[in-house]
Amino acid sequence: MAEEYSWDSYLNDRLLATNQVSGAGLASEEDGVVYACVAQGEESDPNFDKWSLFYKEDYDIEVEDENGTKTTKTINEGQTILVVFNEGYAPDGVWLGGTKYQFINIERDLEFEGYNFDVATCAKLKGGLHLVKVPGGNILVVLYDEEKEQDRGNSKIAALTFAKELAESSQ
């Protein structure tokens, strides 16, 4: 009996192994929650948990409006991902693993080697992420880390190459 090839293995072999990304995951298009992920860990940290980069239970943050009034807002990370695709922007950013990523842009029907994808790009200090709607009701989440000599452009190409593979396999 052949060993089952898991999403984690597939993400690792096709994305993480390129060294163009520091992490990759798949989220459901229904709720935006990441259900499979891989990440480059710190070799010096035996307690590294890849999930800490991709998921955190709902939590509250304090936000300040233009008048300086502080209020509490509950963050549901999956919903912050869905807002990007449903609304075309994310005024409160995209949150993943408790980290806020500033929304940069969304490209609808971006053509890549014969396939079209909706692609969103978000940034944080010295890194960022790409969100790509892929066939099968999934959203590909790709992280890049400039401190690991990764950049927005090359990580986006790696994400789109993987998205193309998924599109080809779903035909």
Curated annotation (Swiss-Prot):
Keywords per UniProt: Actin-binding, Cytoplasm, Cytoskeleton, Lipid-binding
One Pfam entry name: Profilin
Localisation: Cytoplasm, Cytoskeleton
InterPro entries hit by this protein: PFN (IPR048278), PFN_euk (IPR005455), PFN_sf (IPR036140), Profilin_apicomplexa (IPR016814)
Region (Pro-rich sequence-binding): 5-10
Predominant place of localization: cytoplasm
SMART domains listed in its UniProt record: PROF (SM00392)
Positions bearing the site annotation: Interaction with actin: Y89
Marked site positions, Interaction with Pro-rich sequence: Y35
Motif (Plasmodium-specific profilin mini-domain): 48-54
GO cellular component: actin cytoskeleton; cytoplasm
GO MF, any single term: phospholipid binding
Region listing for Actin-binding, in residue ranges: 100-112, 152-156
Keyword rRNA-binding: no
Highest taxon above the source species: Eukaryota
Keyword DNA damage: no
Quaternary structure, from the entry: Binds actin.
Family: Belongs to the profilin family.
Described function: Essential for the invasive blood stages of the parasite. Binds to proline rich sequences in various regulatory formin-like proteins and also to membrane phospholipids. Binds to actin and affects the structure of the cytoskeleton. Weakly sequesters actin monomers.
Comment on protein domains: The actin binding residues are poorly conserved between Plasmodium and other organisms. The Plasmodium-specific profilin mini-domain may have a role in binding to membrane phospholipids.
Protein name: Profilin
Organism: Plasmodium falciparum (isolate HB3)
